[in-house]
């Protein structure tokens, strides 16, 4: 129970009472968590709503909120018992690019005085937010360390080249980072320990390249 009190967990999907205001919903949840003193509870609600930049919306009904705003209410909820560790699962899934950036910045802000652990498949979120990263594939820890050190693992393994659509079909799709039709040719970014085509040029890796290299054991 002592360890549990230190952790706040936000699942990828969580339920709320949509017709309640943000304040009333959090007030109700605070009572369920044992915060019975009305003065203490009011101060706590003000603190968590300001922490997630939702205090100005405290009297608005939750069903009027965007996806990103609801996620912030979720963070406010798990902050109610002042945890030292926040665990959030796929926090930016389903958010539009602008809301994703805002929520990502919120997690960085909250990490200044607590530990924030979040799982995600969005590589950009990791590159922009994390100072430590763990890559887990099928229950196996493939990497743990700094993102910059992880990128180094893909050094000399990333290639770019243009290729005809016919030859593109012969490439191993598991090693294609991305591709784009460019006129009559296809521009390809590819991971391999050796040059995949005669015209392939080595390029500087990024975190996504390194992630794929780890998954493919390159």
Segments from the language model and where they lie:
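Q-loop/switch helix immediately C-terminal to the Walker
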Residues: 13, 18-32
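Conserved ABC ATPase "signature" region
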Residues: 27, 31, 39-57
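Conserved ABC ATPase signature
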Residues: 61-65
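Hydrophobic anchor residue at the start of the ABC signature
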Residues: 75
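Catalytic Walker B motif of ABC-type/P-loop ATPase nucleotide-binding domains
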Residues: 86-89
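Short loop immediately C-terminal to the Walker-B catalytic DE motif
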Residues: 92-93, 123
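ABC transporter nucleotide-binding domain
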Residues: 103-190
